[in-house]
């Protein structure tokens, strides 16, 4: 099923019980975040706040708060059908000519869909029913959400930013967070490798000092919104891909103040320019990692016109510790990624980006291994094939018999098949998300690959001396005794599947260097010395037996090369890796550490008191 605009989609969701209208007055400052966060974590509906306090424009949140609604937005009934979308993209990325008449017939549905890809240009559109310009331009009239108490300013989150570089025919659509700093100015935070930033860079080279035209659309139809977050081939526009999803051409109209084409059905559109010489400090904001990011300088977008539909809807969201809406999108788009990767690497059986790993910082791959060293080739492929994975810090590769989405199964493969030292790969000074405060410097850090596949003869020949499995299995693990080894230890978890070879240790860390101090004490215990291969050390705020907590700590609090301790194996001691997933003190790092997002107890209590009245769940 396809949807011509956002309102058509909302009507469909409401009929299915997937949209809740909130008539009670709610403040866009913090209250909407608290309500939306609770709803998303419970798998609840999209929310339409019809009476935002101080504003006349309703606010839509949690639109893509379940993977099922993402699938609906892409015209699919079930999440598993998103694999078909990935197959289309894989084909469009590297199309193959038909091998014969039957093959041509099989490809016919794709060819028919491709015919719907060009845009349909309109002379008039609903998104320009109302036009503000000059002194009328005023973001204070739009209910822009403030998400967390320590955020520096209100934040625009779901805008489709439309740009065109001077050397390209097609436009780029991207979603970048935007900090409100005045009634007609926002800060455009886009990473250097993203399409909008690349277009601006090319513009500055060709037209130095000249203003760069930009339009930002809020509340487009779901296919166009989701097209902007999907790994579309560079040769294909997001509008064309949206037409492919929808089964009909994307309708666009020219902006009133520049030549950029915007979604004709959008609810609100900001138009203006970026002065290449105008920058401002962006942040800090609570983001998808669960922490506040550092301040960074980014370009300022000056708004000259705001156009909108009559009685528009403002589409918004929040970002915070997973799960949040970006994490849910990541789970759904995971199904799209699999066929794209399989096109290049047919040996891949499954690919999983766990949402608790901030959606992209860790990947688990299962594969049909065909030769020694094959797992390392797949690791390199993941890091290099798609831009979406250039910031993935950890890649774990397992055999096809392993369930990539089950941490017990993955850990079992790690403990059974890995020499922690020889089967781990570290690469330093690689591109890293600038929001990753655990990296040594902004934008540059290390990556780690873990080969948890069953080893072939050539690989075993490199293993050298190892502890006898039969001997090690006879040594029991006494968790209570281990807790008493060091006073800083508050809890220890040994997964049943790991046979004592993997443990999670919680400590009450109070100063630098205590992780190493604790594990060195544990290494003196014979059972740990002989059997253990992996230790994850976490702070006391992590649940030792909760994989979501553990993976979140590893992916947010570690630089793999700096924070992984190693000990080589011998005939009397197993090789070991220690993941120091604790918060770091100034002596242990070279940049400012992240501040965790914390909820205001008074706000939580206020929403508690009103929760039943909302009737959301």
Curated annotation (Swiss-Prot):
Q: Which Gene3D superfamilies match?
A: Single helix bin (1.20.5.570), UbiD C-terminal domain-like (3.40.1670.10)
Top class in the EC scheme:
lyase
Question: What are its GO biological-process terms?
Answer: ubiquinone biosynthetic process
Keywords associated with the record: Cell membrane, Decarboxylase, Lyase, Membrane, Ubiquinone biosynthesis
Q: What EC identifiers does the entry list?
A: 4.1.1.-
Region called Unknown insert, residue ranges:
460-588
Spell out the InterPro entries in the cross-references.
Answer: UbiD, UbiD-like_C, UbiD-like_N, UbiD_Rift_dom
Q: In which pathway does it act?
A: Cofactor biosynthesis; ubiquinone biosynthesis
Task: Give the bilayer topology.
Answer: Peripheral membrane protein
What would be an example GO MF term here?
Answer: 3-octaprenyl-4-hydroxybenzoate carboxy-lyase activity
Give the required cofactors. Answer: a divalent metal cation
For the keyword Cell membrane, the answer is yes
**Tree of life domain:** Bacteria
Gene Ontology CC terms, in alphabetical order? cytosol; plasma membrane
- What is said about its interaction partners and assembly? Homohexamer.
> What is the recorded function of this protein according to its Swiss-Prot or TrEMBL entry?
Catalyzes the decarboxylation of 3-octaprenyl-4-hydroxy benzoate to 2-octaprenylphenol.
Which NCBIfam families is this protein grouped with? PRK10922.1, UbiD family decarboxylase
Q: This chain belongs to which protein, by name?
A: 3-octaprenyl-4-hydroxybenzoate carboxy-lyase
Whose protein is this, by species?
A: Vibrio vulnificus (strain CMCP6)
């Amino acid at each position: 099923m396809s949807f011509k605009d956002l309102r058509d989609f909302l009507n469909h969701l409401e009929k299915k019980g997937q949209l809740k209208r909130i008539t009670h007055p709610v403040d866009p400052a913090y209250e909407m975040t608290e309500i939306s966060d609770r709803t998303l974590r419970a798998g609840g509906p999209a929310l339409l706040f019809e009476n935002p306090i101080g504003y006349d424009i309703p606010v839509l949140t949690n639109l893509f708060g379940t993977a099922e609604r993402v699938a609906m937005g892409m015209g699919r009934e079930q999440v598993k059908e998103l694999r078909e979308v990935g197959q289309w993209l894989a084909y469009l990325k590297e199309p193959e000519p038909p091998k014969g008449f039957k093959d041509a017939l099989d490809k016919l549905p794709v060819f028919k869909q491709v015919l719907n890809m060009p845009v349909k240009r309109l002379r008039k559109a609903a998104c320009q029913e109302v036009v503000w310009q000059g002194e009328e331009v005023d973001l204070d009239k739009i209910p822009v959400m403030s998400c967390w108490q320590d955020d520096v300013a209100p934040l625009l989150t779901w805008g489709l930013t439309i740009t065109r570089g001077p050397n390209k025919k097609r436009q780029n659509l991207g979603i970048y967070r935007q900090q409100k700093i005045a009634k007609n100015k926002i800060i455009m935070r886009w990473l250097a490798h993203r399409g909008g930033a690349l277009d601006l860079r090319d513009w500055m080279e060709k037209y130095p000092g000249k203003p760069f035209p930009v339009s930002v659309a809020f509340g487009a139809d779901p296919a166009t919104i989701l097209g902007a977050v999907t790994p579309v081939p560079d040769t294909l526009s997001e509008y064309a891909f949206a037409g492919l999803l929808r089964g009909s051409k994307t309708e666009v109209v020219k902006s009133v103040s520049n030549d950029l084409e915007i979604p004709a059905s959008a609810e609100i559109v900001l138009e203006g320019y970026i002065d290449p010489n105008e920058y401002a400090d962006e942040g800090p904001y609570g983001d998808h990692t669960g922490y506040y990011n550092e301040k960074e300088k980014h370009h300022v977008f000056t708004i000259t016109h705001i156009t909108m539909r009559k009685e528009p809807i403002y589409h918004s969201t929040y970002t915070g510790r997973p799960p949040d809406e970006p994490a849910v999108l990541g789970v759904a788009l995971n199904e799209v990624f699999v066929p794209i990767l399989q096109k290049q690497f047919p040996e891949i059986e499954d690919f999983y980006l766990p949402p608790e790993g901030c959606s992209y910082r860790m990947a688990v791959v299962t594969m049909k291994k065909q030769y020694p060293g094959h797992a390392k080739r797949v690791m390199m492929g993941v890091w290099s094939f798609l831009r979406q994975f250039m910031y993935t810090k950890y890649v774990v590769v397992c055999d096809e018999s392993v369930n990539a989405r089950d941490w017990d199964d993955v850990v079992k493969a790690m403990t059974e098949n890995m020499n922690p030292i020889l089967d781990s790969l570290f690469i330093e000074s690689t591109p890293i998300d600038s929001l990753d405060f655990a990296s040594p410097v902004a934008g540059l850090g290390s990556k780690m690959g873990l080969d948890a596949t069953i080893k072939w003869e050539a690989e075993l020949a490199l293993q050298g001396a190892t502890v006898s499995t039969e001997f090690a299995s006879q040594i029991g693990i006494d968790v209570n005794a281990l807790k008493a080894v060091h006073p800083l230890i508050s809890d220890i978890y040994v997964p049943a599947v790991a046979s004592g070879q993997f443990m999670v240790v919680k400590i009450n860390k109070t100063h630098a260097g205590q992780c190493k101090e604790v594990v060195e004490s544990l290494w003196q215990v014979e059972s740990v010395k002989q059997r253990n291969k992996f230790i994850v050390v976490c702070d006391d705020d992590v649940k030792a037996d909760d994989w979501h907590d553990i993976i979140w700590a590893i992916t947010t609090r570690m630089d793999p090369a700096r924070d992984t301790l190693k000990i080589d194996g011998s005939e009397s001691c197993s090789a070991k890796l220690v993941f120091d997933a604790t918060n770091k003190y100034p002596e242990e790092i070279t940049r400012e550490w992240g501040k965790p997002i914390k909820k205001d107890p008074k706000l939580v209590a206020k929403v508690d008191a009103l929760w039943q009245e909302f009737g959301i769940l």
